[in-house]
Amino acid sequence: MHPAAEDSPLGKSSEYLDTYTPSLLFPIPRAPKWAELGLAAENLPYRGVDVWNCYELSWLLPSGKPVVAVGEFVIPADSPNIVESKSFKLYLNSLNQTVFADREALRQTLARDLSAATGAPVAVRLRSLGEVQEQGVAALPGQCIDELDVTIGRYGQPSAELLRCDPARRVEQVLHSHLLKSNCPVTGQPDWGSLVVDYHGPALDPASLLAYVVSFRQHADFHEQCVERIFLDLLRLLEPGRLTVYARYVRRGGLDINPWRSTGAVVADNRRLARQ
């Protein structure tokens, strides 16, 4: 478990406040998890973002009338901290009985508080329900590998040695799977996700990628670190011309987390999937 997570609200009973309380946000440093992967802030081999979507966001107008919206929060992947998810939920719930002059006043407040907690500029967008409905449900790009006939016997730890490629054949390819699962390192609760691998390089064997994805099934780690581990394992194997790895996780507590890691600039396509 991440040492800082032991002091977070995750896995503990909590009092739900309904008036604005920014101190509820609980930062967790990324550095210890980077160190586990042999990384440090000054030598990250990727660019990226973590996109959080909040479906339980409400506040009051000056008239006392409630408003609801869907919040989108984009956190840089090189920010010093992430925000522990339950503390994020508690913070957002503290807005429920708080008056804001208008939507922009709330957006600025959210951006200020989350930027302070993560140590980096956080972009905030508040979307109306009509906008979200119009956007609809998206399908992942590329080839789905989930129906491949493979025999799998490893579920405990991510196993990079399962991955195989053909160095003699270079391709542009997008593969995806809906079978990503890991466990919260604090509570042990399952984290369900869908994974996309978009690359240019030696042809990755799809069946080996599927076995590798499933090897995370009993692994305990945060969403962000799982995606970073996958990115690094593929980067080492393929030495690709370009590589983007991202996952869209099923929401819990009204929040879903969607980490993107890439060798190039990231433009996150933040459209929800059927399970989100």
From Swiss-Prot:
The gene is queF. GO terms for cellular component: cytoplasm. The keyword Cytoplasm applies. InterPro entries: GTP-CH-I_C/QueF, NADPH_dep_7-cyano-7-deazaG_red, QueF, QueF_N, QueF_type2. Its main location: cytoplasm. It is found in: Cytoplasm. This is NADPH-dependent 7-cyano-7-deazaguanine reductase. It comes from Azotobacter vinelandii (strain DJ / ATCC BAA-1303). The keyword Cytoplasm applies. One of its GO terms (biological process) is queuosine biosynthetic process. GO terms for molecular function: preQ1 synthase activity.
